[in-house]
Amino acid sequence: MRFLTIFILLISLLNAKDRDFYYSFIDSNGKQIPTKTKETIINTLNQLDEVKAIALDGKLHEAFEKLKIIKDNNKVSLLNADILILYSELVIKTNSKQHINSTSNELEVAINSSLIDQEDLLKAYLILIDLKLNINKVEDARYYAQTVVDIFDDEEAKAKGKISLAKIFKYQKDYKKASKVIFEVLSDTKDKNIASIAANELFDIYLLEGRKEEANELMRQILATNPSFYSSDYIV
């Protein structure tokens, strides 16, 4: 389990450009979306913003219940992926045992069926890995973590895939392997936020190994080099 980590959503708010895309979307027949459907999209996006705000305020169960209603009643396929990714994360954050297995399956199908937009694919994979660990499907989690390392070209994605592998080793209590992977990430990256994410995992590993002094020193270094890492505004 993480220590001192403030709840952070993986899902960032849609910006104006994203919304313009939704509003002007042309269907497969070359026809513009009807006005009523546009209004539904706008209303749903506003509701998703409200859910995120509630979650960031620490009211996770309230946010989850509101999102579940949105998900169950959504009729616009264009919004399915956005809703599912946020829903999946809140399932993890609320530790919802009732929904975690079905959500893992649903997200896995969405990814493997290419229903997730490329820009959201990394987020979806990382959430799926956490879902798999939560239901003790370690080999599945490792497969998807390695997939992230293999299929993404950018260094940030590869680093996050390696950090996920370290989390899996940590889950298996193989702290030596977990630490090795984290040190590889730290030695390769020049990105301050990636380094902070990796160091935070190493902090957990140190605590689990009983190395409290080293953990405390590491935390001081994280806060000194990247004080915004634990703020609610930070997006992984």
Q: What are these model-derived regions, one by one?
A:
Residues 1-8:
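Sec-dependent signal peptide recognition
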Residues 6, 15-236:
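Acidic, polar-rich low-complexity tracts and alpha-helical solenoid repeat scaffolds
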Residues 11-13:
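N-terminal signal peptide c-region/cleavage motif recognized by signal peptidases
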